[in-house]
Amino acid sequence: MSEKTIVVLPGDHVGTEITNEAIKVLKAIEEVRPNVKFNFQHHLIGGAAIDATGVPLPDEALEAAKKADAVLLGAVGGPKWGTGAVRPEQGLLKIRKELNLYANLRPCNFASESLLELSPIKAEFAKGTDFTVVRELVGGIYFGERKEDDGSGVASDTETYSVPEVQRITRMAAFMALQHNPPLPIWSLDKANVLASSRLWRKTVTETIEKEFPQLTVQHQLIDSAAMILIKSPTTLNGIVITSNMFGDIISDEASVIPGSLGLLPSASLASLPDTNKAFGLYEPCHGSAPDLPANKVNPIATILSAAMMLKLSLDLFEEGVALEKAVKEVLDAGVRTGDLRGSNSTKEVGDAAVEAAKRILKN
């Protein structure tokens, strides 16, 4: 038996509820698979960490994460901590940088076709949407040179990218494309008509694909045009979508409304290619901490699907990850849903249903 260590960072507000449901489903796998054992280690991050320690990411949490097989994160932030000098989101940025989590993967698809009616896009246009945004996560404007307003009325942020950074994220996108037969097309989003960093981005993506992955195709699209296409004809972008940190942040949030709720979409942030299904990664839902949501009302599906990604990409438990995805589809098809999906079930009820479905699938 090989024990997998998972550092759990619940974070703020609904973070504890959603990570609890994901853990519950993972423990169900332990029950069915005697050779699988998880070691869950809980630590603080975000506003909860600020309240307890004065910093958004305590050293002990970071050190535990460095030694783990994977990290499961809930959500951070909330109006309580405002936009002061010490903010919850700083903990998230720090852990990404310290763990070198350079690639953020955000799938956009329908976990169940029964959800098509909930999409703000007409079903005939939304049906079949299936792409993954591969976002560069530790470079660009979020980590560039920054100048706060010192009273002069001027502030600035600097966007910087290097060839090695762009090559690295391009190789991740290529790897993901090659997991399919035939390989998926790659879309690269930038603002090369205006930004020097985007011109370097486009040139490097093109050269890397041509030299290292000649069997793949890449199409370049300006980010503003891509944002329009995403609403007008989302299936046009089916495949792998690669882009920079800020553009990826924006376009993936826009994409997240297509399936009908932020509560459905998982994400993975990886430190290496998952070529042996053992890449170190941090897994979290795409939604925020939802401070105004009453207890037991948050949708846990995105976090459960994040756990499924963790099983497949970091813990070398691919079959179990697929089983979780099938379980989620069964739950949604059965109409067990929280309020964001026009359902009446609680967080716990959805989690319980996922547990029972996963057990049944794994036993067959």
UniProtKB/Swiss-Prot annotation:
EC top class named in words: oxidoreductase
A GO BP annotation: L-leucine biosynthetic process
Main location: cytoplasm
Function: Catalyzes the oxidation of 3-carboxy-2-hydroxy-4-methylpentanoate (3-isopropylmalate) to 3-carboxy-4-methyl-2-oxopentanoate. The product decarboxylates to 4-methyl-2 oxopentanoate.
Site residues (Important for catalysis), renumbered to this chain: Y142, K191
Enzymatic reactions: (2R,3S)-3-isopropylmalate + NAD(+) = 4-methyl-2-oxopentanoate + CO2 + NADH
Full protein name: 3-isopropylmalate dehydrogenase
Phylogenetic classification of the source organism: Eukaryota, Fungi, Dikarya, Ascomycota, Saccharomycotina
Binding site for substrate: R96, R106, R135, D224
Essential cofactor(s): Mg(2+); Mn(2+)
E.C. number(s) listed in UniProt: 1.1.1.85
MF terms (GO), sorted A to Z: 3-isopropylmalate dehydrogenase activity; magnesium ion binding; NAD binding
Keywords: Amino-acid biosynthesis, Branched-chain amino acid biosynthesis, Cytoplasm, Leucine biosynthesis, Magnesium, Manganese, Metal-binding, NAD, Oxidoreductase
Metabolic or biological pathway: Amino-acid biosynthesis; L-leucine biosynthesis; L-leucine from 3-methyl-2-oxobutanoate: step 3/4
Assembly mode: Homodimer.
Cellular compartment(s): Cytoplasm
Superkingdom of the source species: Eukaryota
GO cellular component: cytosol
InterPro entries for this protein: IsoCit/isopropylmalate_DH_CS (IPR019818), IsoPropMal-DH-like_dom (IPR024084), Isopropylmalate_DH (IPR004429)
Pfam family, one: Iso_dh
Entries under PANTHER family matching the protein: 3-ISOPROPYLMALATE DEHYDROGENASE
Species this chain originates from: Wickerhamomyces anomalus (strain ATCC 8168 / CBS 5759 / DSM 6766 / JCM 3585 / IAM 12210 / NCYC 432 / NBRC 10213 / NRRL Y-366 / AJ 5027) (Yeast)
Cofactor: how and how many bound: Binds 1 Mg(2+) or Mn(2+) ion per subunit.
PROSITE patterns, alphabetized: IDH_IMDH (PS00470)
Homology family: Belongs to the isocitrate and isopropylmalate dehydrogenases family.
Residues holding NAD(+): 78-89, 288-299
Residues binding Mg(2+), per UniProt: D224, D249, D253
